[in-house]
Amino acid sequence: MSKRAFNFCAGPAALPDAVLQRAQAELLDWRGKGLSVMEMSHRSDDYVAIASKAEQDLRDLLDIPSDYKVLFLQGGASQQFAEIPLNLLPEDGVADYIDTGIWSKKAIEEARRYGTVNVAASAKEYDYFAIPGQNEWTLTKDAAYVHYASNETIGGLEFDWIPETGDVPLVTDMSSDILSRPLDVSRFGLIYAGAQKNIGPSGLVVVIVREDLLGRARSVCPTMLNYKIAADNGSMYNTPATYSWYLSGLVFEWLKEQGGVTAMEQRNRAKKDLLYKTIDASDFYTNPIQPSARSWMNVPFRLADERLDKPFLEGAEARGLLNLKGHRSVGGMRASIYNALGLDAVEALVAYMAEFEKEHG
C-alpha cells in the first residue's frame, strides 16, 4: 500500500486512518453478520444499535444535556439555512443574524425567503478580517433567535467566545469546528454541523436542538424538514444516510479513544500555533485575520507573489501535501487542519513552506 497523503481539504476532509481501516475491515462482513452496514435495513436491531451508540458517544463527547435532542439528518448544513427559519421563525417574527463571511451570508439570504432578518452585526466593516465585538451588535429585543457561524471555513474567522443572548435562543453553524475543543452546549438553543469536516463523510448533518424549540414549525414546513417529526422518529422518518451515520459513529469512538475533546483542544492548539507562528515569522507568507479571530481549523495564507501559487501547489502535491488551494472566492492557500490531521501533517507543511520560501523568497 502506498503512503497516505496529508489531506488539507476543507471538506470532504481527512478521516482518521484508524476509522478507515476499521470500516475497510467491516465492509463486506459486519461483525460476522455476512453483510455490509450499507446493506442493512435501517429498522434492523443491528443498525438501530449502531445509530444509538453513535448518538450516545456524541452526547458523551460534548456532554449534551438530557433536554436536547440529537438529530442525524440529510441535506447538509446548507439545507439548515432554510430549515431553521421554517422551524423557529414565526411569520410575524424577526431573526437576528451575524455576518462574518460567506457561509453566514448564505444563511442570511436563505432566511430572508421566509421572514424578516435583522443583520445585527457584520464583519464587512473590518473587511471580514475581524469579528465585531458584541458591544457593536444591534440585537432585536424579542428576536425568534440569534444565528451566527462559529467558524467561517472560507475566510478563516472563528469566534473564540460564545455570544450572550439572554432568553433569545442562540443558533450556530458549527460545521467546521464542532468537536475541536470543549463546548458548553447548554448556552445554545440549536447547533448544527455538516458532517464532512470534523464528524465523518458527507451526506449527513447533525442537529443538536433544545426540546422546548420543537413543535414550532410553520404549517408550510415540509414534513421532511420538521425537527419535531425527525425527533419523534429517531431521525428515521425516512431512510437515513446509514453509512455516513455509521462512519460518524466510528469517528466518535476514535475521538473518545484519543481522550475526547479536551485532548483534541491540546492537539489542535499545537497545530494552529505552529502554522500561524510560521506564517507570522515570514515576510513571504501572510494571513490578514486579526489574531483573536483566527480560525483553529481553517488557515488561509497568501504568498508574496501570486504567480508562485501554481508552483507552490505543484511542489506540495509532489510531497503528499494535498488540497492546499484556497477557495475560489478568496484565492491564495488554505490549510484545513481538522481533528483527523495530526501535528505531523502541519510539521510537514511548515517544513515545505520554509523550503519553498528559501528557494523563491
From Swiss-Prot:
Catalytic activity: O-phospho-L-serine + 2-oxoglutarate = 3-phosphooxypyruvate + L-glutamate; 4-(phosphooxy)-L-threonine + 2-oxoglutarate = (R)-3-hydroxy-2-oxo-4-phosphooxybutanoate + L-glutamate
One Pfam short name: Aminotran_5
Keyword NADP: no
A biological process from GO: L-serine biosynthetic process
N-terminal signal peptide: none
Functional note: Catalyzes the reversible conversion of 3-phosphohydroxypyruvate to phosphoserine and of 3-hydroxy-2-oxo-4-phosphonooxybutanoate to phosphohydroxythreonine.
UniProt EC number: 2.6.1.52
Annotated residues for binding of pyridoxal 5'-phosphate: A77, S78, W103, T153, D173, Q196, N238, T239
Gene source species: Pseudomonas aeruginosa (strain LESB58)
Biological classification of the source: Bacteria, Pseudomonadati, Pseudomonadota, Gammaproteobacteria, Pseudomonadales
Residue list for modification N6-(pyridoxal phosphate)lysine: K197
Protein name from the UniProt record: Phosphoserine aminotransferase
Oligomeric and partner information: Homodimer.
Family designation: Belongs to the class-V pyridoxal-phosphate-dependent aminotransferase family. SerC subfamily.
An annotated Gene Ontology molecular function: pyridoxal phosphate binding
Cofactor binding annotation: Binds 1 pyridoxal phosphate per subunit.
PANTHER family (UniProt xref): PHOSPHOSERINE AMINOTRANSFERASE
NCBIfam families: PRK05355.1, serC_1
Top enzyme class: transferase
